[in-house]
């Protein structure tokens, strides 16, 4: 499955996981959206139903700083916008924070959800904390894997209710 990176050059180059994916030939740099655009502001959620699109046209990650990105920037990118369901960062900067994943964590999660588990694990192996991310989210990733959008939304709703203590 092709992975593309749009790099806004707003991250510390030494910590930029998108550039690492490109450097190690796990992703290709692009200036335009291709296929599925991972967009944290999207109402639609990535699911197994998106696998055909991802296989044909790839997945695009927008590599930017969480502190300097906006919904408007994502809206300008053409493609099929999807967000990831609730997952927790395993990276040292945002460890344990829901939804605040690094680019490489977003790629790993996307591949896992689309049932490309071997490829997800292969990419997790290129960073020290890749397996931390997988272990931290193992139960969630397995529950999202191979599921439809509605099934994932229901699982996510249940997880959020447990976290905030709603009945």
Curated annotation (Swiss-Prot):
Transferase found in the keyword field: yes
Protein EC: 2.5.1.157
Gene Ontology molecular function terms on file: 18S rRNA aminocarboxypropyltransferase activity; S-adenosyl-L-methionine binding
Superkingdom of the source species: Archaea
Binding site for S-adenosyl-L-methionine: 17, 62, 84, 99, 103
HAMAP family: TSR3
Protein name: 16S rRNA aminocarboxypropyltransferase
